[in-house]
């Protein structure tokens, strides 16, 4: 099987509704199943919201493989709790240019998002986040 190795995937996040909203998400996790990790990422749901000037980002997946909240690292981003009652802001619908090279995944992965919440849904989501984070 081989031992677990530290793997890093860098993903370019682009909001298809606003091309200026681009950020790099660096996912660092211990796994020896890089292909499964890539597929997990492609099927995951990304939560992101700006609350009181802070952008919260979290990848939600039911897979046993990373990513989980404790391995997400990105400049200008922080992780947030998973909402137990569901709901999302962006759904990851496409993951391209990710492949293995000498046991590593190419770091020029590109991600495209769709599914924007309405203002009322966003307000409700923001309220839930405020409660979870103790900001109310």
Swiss-Prot record:
It comes from the Viruses. Its main location: host cell. Disulfide bonds: none annotated. One of its GO terms (cellular component) is host cell nucleus. Keywords: Host cytoplasm, Host mitochondrion, Host nucleus, Host-virus interaction, Inhibition of host adaptive immune response by virus, Inhibition of host innate immune response by virus, Inhibition of host interferon signaling pathway by virus, Inhibition of host IRF3 by virus, Inhibition of host IRF7 by virus, Inhibition of host MAVS by virus, Inhibition of host RIG-I by virus, Inhibition of host RLR pathway by virus, Inhibition of host STAT2 by virus, Inhibition of host TBK1 by virus, Inhibition of host TLR pathway by virus, Interferon antiviral system evasion, Modulation of host cell apoptosis by virus, Viral immunoevasion. It is found in: Host cytoplasm; Host mitochondrion; Host nucleus. One of its GO terms (biological process) is symbiont-mediated suppression of host cytoplasmic pattern recognition receptor signaling pathway via inhibition of TBK1 activity. Monomer. Homomultimer. Heteromultimer with NS2. Interacts with the matrix protein M. Interacts with host ELOC and CUL2; this interaction allows NS1 to form an active E3 ligase with ELOC and CUL2. Interacts with host IRF3; this interaction leads to the disrupted association of IRF3 with CREBBP and thus reduced binding of IRF3 to the IFN-beta promoter. Interacts with host MAVS; this interaction prevents MAVS binding to RIGI and inhibits signaling pathway leading to interferon production. Plays a major role in antagonizing the type I IFN-mediated antiviral response by degrading or inhibiting multiple cellular factors required for either IFN induction or response pathways. Acts cooperatively with NS2 to repress activation and nuclear translocation of host IFN-regulatory factor IRF3. Also disrupts the association of IRF3 with CREBBP. Interacts with host mitochondrial-associated membrane (MAM) MAVS and prevents the interaction with RIGI. Interacts with TRIM25 to suppress TRIM25-mediated RIGI ubiquitination and thereby RIGI-MAVS interaction. Belongs to the pneumovirus non-structural protein 1 family. This is Non-structural protein 1. It comes from Ovine respiratory syncytial virus (strain WSU 83-1578). The gene is 1C.
